[in-house]
């Protein structure tokens, strides 16, 4: 058995996430206390009580998801004291920060401050209504990229996430995204507009990438205890000098999730823990590598299942 740890990204948030884990785990509660102190505000109250409209704001959702994922991991480690480190870890977009905290490369406090700044910068990079994101299904990647070139007409539109076979997310100017969507539908594919606050992971995020680069100059990065498969190149990295470069490139670069999962399988990974809110990654993994066994751990009941899963 070879295990990977996977950490979810933005969109997995919900009011009350992790509440039963906090109730059962002093270690998880300590994580939330550290996050509140680091941000000098009661983010934990927003996570647990809402309102949902405030939690979904990018500058709140990003630190909230990292906090919850790290709290769940703390509860797992508390419950399974002899838990072995994974062979590899990966996070979907924002989740890469959670993975770096799990590996000891980033301090929790630095991570939540970083993603607070990252979230604000991503929100401010594009005015409301200017950008859009759509999920595309039923079109091959090469053909979709050709559609993006055809539909751009001087605007930005490109693949943002290669999530799973048959599911690619595009991002860019709203008009260009709409034109690509029309081409997709004409080609018998499907295009679903996603409700997000900004067109993440495309060239419009270049100003946000510069902000993240500046913020990272103030943050120490240690050598991760295990390699992290980076979003932008789907390759394992354990070099602290490259962590910052990869995080900067990630802001306006493509999330290569399908390729990342395939890289983990090629490295021998047979089992994975999805650590944090939701079960989005387990669903994607099932479409990428159906033989890879995944346990989604986002509540207290799942924490209790970890020992049996990793021991079996």
Which stretches of residues belong to each language-model region?
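FabD-like malonyl-/acyl-CoA
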Residues: 1-144, 194, 271-305
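A short, well-structured juxtamembrane/interface segment
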Residues: 255-263
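Non-catalytic positions within long, well-ordered alpha-helices that form the structural scaffold/packing
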Residues: 265-268
